[in-house]
Amino acid sequence: MTALENNSPYIAQPKILVATDCIVFGFDEGILKLLVFRRRIDPLKGEWSLIGSFVNEEESVPDAARRVLLQFTGLENIFLEELRVYSDVERDSGARCISIAQYALIRINDYDREQVELHGAKWFALEDIPQLVLDHNVMIFDALDRLRQKTTHKPIGFELLPEKFTIPQLQSLYEAIHQTKLDDRNFRKKLLSFDLLIKLDEKDKSTSKKGAFLYRFDYGKYKKLEESGINFVL
C-alpha cells in the first residue's frame, strides 16, 4: 500500500469500523434454527448476539464472514450470501460501525460441536430467538425474508438438508421456512416435475417400517437448466 501524505484527504477522514454479522440458519427435525452466542466484548458483553467480527484490513467482507464461520462452526465451503448493509449512525454505542450482514445455510449435523460450545454458541428455534444486541433481530427478520423469497425460485434449501434426503423431509423444510402447511400430493408432483432429483436405491426407515426413498439433488443438471433460463419455482 502506498504511503499517504499527511495532508491527504484520506488521512483527514473520520475512521469508521466495518464489521460483518452472520445469520446462520440450520434445519433440525422439522425446525428452522439460528445460531447465536453470548457477546464477549463491551458494550453489551454477555448478551445474546449474532456471530460476527470486525473486517481486518487485509481481507474482504466475504472472507471475514468465512473466517468467522470457520471459527465458530468448523465448516468451510458453505452457502454464504450478502444480505445488506446496516449503517444507522447510532446502531452501535461502542463506536461508529457499519455492518455488512451475510446469511449462511449449513447442514446442522455437519458442524463441529466442540467449536460451537467453545464459543458459547447455541441453536434457537425461530420462535424462541431471544432479544439480541444492537440491530441483530432486524438482521434476522431481513435474512428470513430473503430466504423465503430465494427459496421460491432457487434450490438453496437443499443446502440445509443432508446430501441424501426424503421428499417428506424436503417438504418439512419448505413448510418451516415459509411457515405454512403444503399439500403433500401437489408438492411431490411439482417437485418431481423438474426432474432434478436422483432417486436412490435406499430408504429412510426412521419414521416407519415401510420407509421412504432417499433422493439426491442433481446440481449438475440444475446448472444446465439454469443456464438455459429455466427457474426452479416451487
Regions of interest found by a model, annotated:
Residues 7-48:
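N-terminal strand-loop-strand
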Residues 203-234:
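Long, intrinsically disordered, low-complexity Ser/Thr/Pro-rich regulatory/activation regions
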Residues 103, 113-147, 162-168, 186-195, ...:
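NUDIX/MutT-family hydrolases
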Residues 182-213:
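RNA substrate-recognition surfaces in RNA-acting enzymes
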Residues 34, 39-41, 45, 52, ...:
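Short, His- and charge-rich active-site/binding loops that engage polyanionic ligands
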Residues 16-18, 62-66, 70-112, 148-157, ...:
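Active-site segment of metal-dependent pyrophosphate-handling enzymes
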